[in-house]
Amino acid sequence: MPLTSPSAIQPQRRLVAVVVFEGVSPFHLSVPCVVFGEGLEPYNPFEIMVCSVDPAPVRTSAGFALTGLRSLRALQKAEVVIVPSWRDINERPPEVLLRALRAAHARGAIIVGLCLGSHV
């Protein structure tokens, strides 16, 4: 009989939040999902959450909808927040998203912007 449980051996998973928006490119969404979600067996130290300003279904640039999204509240617990892209460099993101990103940064989360997401 083992002296410790498997959960005692495995460290707590790090929460990674990926922010999506109406018109997100499936390719840009896939990059953080692959980096933090694939090939890390037998134990993946990351838990990926896909979040949106509006957790209703979000339509991608390819025309299909993303469902089961978390709200921006998930950013309150994430250790890493990734904005994988943005629609247009000249489009200001919603203030609610900017506030959530600032709050995550203020509490020590790592904020990552990929491609146009670096301008958010």
Model-inferred region functions:
Residues 113, 117:
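Gly/Ala-rich beta-loop-alpha elbow adjacent to hydrolase catalytic centers
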Residues 1-111:
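Extended, subdomain-level signal for the structured scaffold at the beginning of enzyme domains
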